[in-house]
Design a protein with these regions (language model features):
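Alpha4 helix (beta4-alpha4-beta5 surface) of REC/receiver domains from two-component response regulators
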Residues: 81-95
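Short, structured coil segments at secondary-structure junctions
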Residues: 29, 70, 92-94
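Acidic, metal-coordinating helix/loop segments flanking the phosphotransfer/catalytic sites
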Residues: 36-48
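Output/docking surface of receiver
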Residues: 93-105
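Short beta-strand elements of ligand-binding domains
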Residues: 73-79
Length: 119
C-alpha cells in the first residue's frame, strides 16, 4: 500500500471539539493542520481545506469559492441529516463532501482520494 504524501491542511472550524479532533487525526496521519476560526483562505502551501459548512461565522458561501480560486481542494462537512448543508456545499463548489462521521472514521481515505485526484 503506497504511503500518502504529507500535506498542509487548513481546518476551518470554530467548534473546539471538532477542531481538536481533526488536528489530532491529521497529525497522526502525518499531515500538518492549520486551524482557522475566521474565513481566511490565504495559505500558499496548503493543498486541502476542511470546512464546516454549518458554521455561519466562517461564511462558507464566500470561503469555498476563495479556496477554489487559490487552488486548494475543499472538503465540506456537515451532519448526515443536514442534507441542505451538504447540498449547499455542493453548490458552493466543494470538491469533496463528507458527513461528520465520514470525516471522523474515513479521513485517511478522503485525503488519499484528494491526492489521487490531484495527480
Amino acid at each position: 500500500m503506497p504511503h500518502n504524501i504529507a500535506m498542509t491542511v487548513l481546518v476551518f472550524e470554530d467548534n473546539l471539539i471538532w477542531s481538536s479532533r481533526l488536528v489530532k487525526s491529521l497529525k497522526a496521519l502525518g499531515h500538518t493542520p492549520i486551524v482557522r476560526i475566521k474565513p481566511d483562505s490565504s495559505s500558499s502551501d496548503a493543498q486541502v481545506a476542511i470546512v464546516n459548512l454549518g458554521s455561519e461565522g466562517l461564511d462558507p458561501e464566500k470561503l469555498v469559492p476563495a479556496l477554489n480560486a487559490a487552488g486548494i481542494h475543499t472538503i465540506g462537512h456537515a451532519g448526515h441529516k443536514e442534507t441542505e448543508l451538504l447540498e449547499f456545499g455542493r453548490s458552493a463548489g466543494c470538491k469533496t463532501l463528507a458527513t461528520n462521521s465520514q470525516l471522523t472514521f474515513k479521513l485517511e481515505s478522503l485525503l488519499a482520494a484528494v491526492q489521487s485526484s490531484d495527480l
